[in-house]
């Protein structure tokens, strides 16, 4: 489905739920559209199950942009899917920057060590980027860690904080407000505006969290 979004964008909807297969199709289509040169197309923005396409309304009408997008969609197949990058993220769980670890464990009737084991025991896909520059929305959590957001968000969550909410996990790239349960911290820099590649993650990446022993990393408070 392709529909207009304002007077200078169109939205391509490939599904209606958070699903890895749908999300992979989004990223496949995004790669195709990004590689195709077409006068008037400005930018593409992938999300969970949609792809937003910005165009210049002085050059293209909605119908022209949609017709081009449909033509590119016909090129979608398994052979065009980008091979995902695999990234490891070191994490110090608990401590000041992982202050919700024990509360998460208690609410689930498991130990903090179990939370760490479950969180670090699988690979996550970066479904999309958003909220603040470089924030990766990743899934899917083990169902035993699925939790609602905090009733009262924090006014400040430190950059590098690893958190969970719903069936997702993410990392705060900047000091910012946040309503997710914070369970750890990573020393990796997720956003560097001075770099030619300012974002550590891109949609479609596969991420594995690696627990760090406490003595190897100073607490990030």
Give the role of each language-model region.
Residues 1-221:
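Glycine-rich active-site loops that engage anionic ligands at enzyme catalytic sites
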